[in-house]
Amino acid sequence: MASTVSPSTIAETPEPPPLSDHIRNAADISVIVIYFLVVMAVGLWAMLKTNRGTIGGFFLAGRDMAWWPMGASLFASNIGSNHYVGLAGTGAASGVATVTFEWTSSVMLLILGWIFVPIYIKSGVMTMPEYLKKRFGGERLQVYLSILSLFICVVLLISADIFAGAIFIKLALGLDLYLAIFILLAMTAVYTTTGGLASVIYTDTLQTIIMLIGSFILMGFAFNEVGGYESFTEKYVNATPSVVEGDNLTISASCYTPRADSFHIFRDAVTGDIPWPGIIFGMPITALWYWCTNQVIVQRCLCGKDMSHVKAACIMCAYLKLLPMFLMVMPGMISRILYTDMVACVVPSECVKHCGVDVGCTNYAYPTMVLELMPQGLRGLMLSVMLASLMSSLTSIFNSASTLFTIDLYTKMRKQASEKELLIAGRIFVLLLTVVSIVWVPLVQVSQNGQLIHYTESISSYLGPPIAAVFVLAIFCKRVNEQGAFWGLMVGLAMGLIRMITEFAYGTGSCLAPSNCPKIICGVHYLYFSIVLFFGSMLVTLGISLLTKPIPDVHLYRLCWVLRNSTEERIDIDAEEKSQEETDDGVEEDYPEKSRGCLKKAYDLFCGLQKGPKLTKEEEEALSKKLTDTSERPSWRTIVNINAILLLAVVVFIHGYYA
């Protein structure tokens, strides 16, 4: 039976004194304080500079964002502290193959910018569930996807980031875990609720710069310490822990020696930890779900000035996604060389002694190197990098979750809600999500496993493929209708939940004690399972759609690929119902506004609730046209297309080099 650690054991395990004392000096603390002050200053500047008093201003930054902050925000929204912990940890455990999750994303970003975003913008939507409502009609798809997306935010996105951030906080600051997380989430929630998407994007840009600078510095220290790249490749394959026996266990050499294919990304289709067919066929499916249908990501692309800026932002982020191999994966592998007994520990009692967890300490590879290698001041900078990655991801999740709740759920409960009420509801929901996140921390703490990145990717493989299948068919197959899409999602969700719940119930097992989960359910690698789930959902969707009535083209103009350039007027499927609701709501009357005191005016300014001048009918039409415009300047179109081709060539080359 596998050794386990109860929550109380984790809480009572003392942190190693040398690590917890590392940040207790004036230089490091000063850098961290300066970081927080600068981030808050940028957030406040964005809060005062941008228009947050309208739905479009708060949730889409008024569609006035340039390509470079959008690209930085896309990168920062994706790269959280769980990447520094998860990618480095899996790199330490098994080598470079884990970077394929990042490199696949570079290709998906091009598909996002060239195929999916033009459809989303032409449809005039703010959220992904809203797109499904326009494309298929009805409300059950919109509500279902909104609730599922919020569920994924809590159990996957937020939980992974908080868990990874908690590792740094515990090691570096020695603070109480819950106090530190509460402070981080509180700061994050404040400038998300007050600043809107523009504030999030500008702070993401700052934090991307901090992340890249700090990560490059640590990479330099790491390669210098290990003696260069050639020395690194030689020493890694010999990095085995000194203690490989104990706890009355018979431990196989494969559990503690580096893999023979550590420096290759394409591994055996059956025995590989990341099999090569899964990389080619399964990984793009989960990447498609995350990058092309995920509210957190797509919302950033919907705020671009024009399509050229959107495409340039996607290219910028795609290039940045090539860096984690050198900034995270290889430093994690170097950490195994430098701190072998801790990072590569295999005997449960030894692992508990080093990091308080019996399943392994690979998740501590990057944090340990930060605290051991970096000099004073730079240690504070690197902790700021970790905090930056954590907070940038959380702000993105909070803002997008707020958008989902407000646009897709709250408007169903309060059909006559004013714009001001919707803005307030969105902000309050962020605060509620903060509370839920804190409550979730104990569950994350006791469910930690040896490799965080495999946890996040497996959950994505169980929940994401049905969503990806429906969006692909919605855009490329106009014959698909609401009944097919709904039941395709339902069947896919049932299949995914059966696999996920069964795996949680039996456990994923470890090298020391394999899981007892039935092979028919858990015996298939999660990347292979994502392929089955994707095409299974697609077949159900197509089959039911072909057996039921098609949607007339008049309802599909600019909502699917073959009709994307149509200039015909589109009639929404629920147009009659919508018209009746507007009639029932009545016309909003203009009442003379009462004089407001200084404190109330300051409150409105801080929360973005101040009213701007009322738009004329012509101005409203111009704004609506701007929000659905996909035009490009010819010169910019040529530049971004050339860069896209160049990027694809680079991605193919690096895959071949490390194959």
From Swiss-Prot:
Q: Which domain of life is it from?
A: Eukaryota
Annotated compartments = Cell membrane
Membrane-topology annotation of the record: Multi-pass membrane protein
Q: Which GO terms describe its molecular function?
A: solute:sodium symporter activity
Question: Which intervals of the chain are annotated as region Disordered?
Answer: 573-592
Question: Membrane side Extracellular: which residues?
Answer: 48-64, 127-171, 230-270, 335-423, 477-526
User: GO cellular component terms?
Assistant: plasma membrane
The residues exposed to the Cytoplasmic compartment are 1-28, 86-105, 192-208, 292-314, 444-455, 548-637
Pfam family membership, one:
SSF
Gene3D superfamilies, alphabetically? Sodium/glucose cotransporter
**List of glycosylated residues:** N248
Regulation affecting activity:
Inhibited by phlorizin.
Kindly report the protein's main subcellular placement as a broad class. membrane
Q: Give GO terms for biological process.
A: sodium ion transport
Comp. bias (Acidic residues): 582-591
What residue intervals traverse the membrane? 29-47, 65-85, 106-126, 172-191, 209-229, 271-291, 315-334, 424-443, 456-476, 527-547, 638-658
Give a brief account of the tissues where this protein occurs.
Expressed in skeletal muscle, where it may localize to the neuromuscular junction (at protein level). Expressed in small intestine where it may localize to cholinergic neurons of the submucosal plexus and myenteric plexus (at protein level). Detected in kidney (at protein level).
Keyword set, alphabetical order: Cell membrane, Glycoprotein, Ion transport, Membrane, Sodium, Sodium transport, Transmembrane, Transmembrane helix, Transport
The function of this protein is: Does not function as sodium/D-glucose symporter. However, may function as a D-glucose sensor by generating a D-glucose-induced depolarization which is pH-independent, Na(+)-dependent at neutral pH and probably H(+)-dependent at acidic pH.
Query: What family name appears in the similarity comment?
Result: Belongs to the sodium:solute symporter (SSF) (TC 2.A.21) family.
Miscellaneous comment: Although it belongs to the sodium:solute symporter (SSF) (TC 2.A.21) family, lacks Na(+)/glucose symporter activity.
Q: Would you tell me the protein name for this molecule?
A: Probable glucose sensor protein SLC5A4
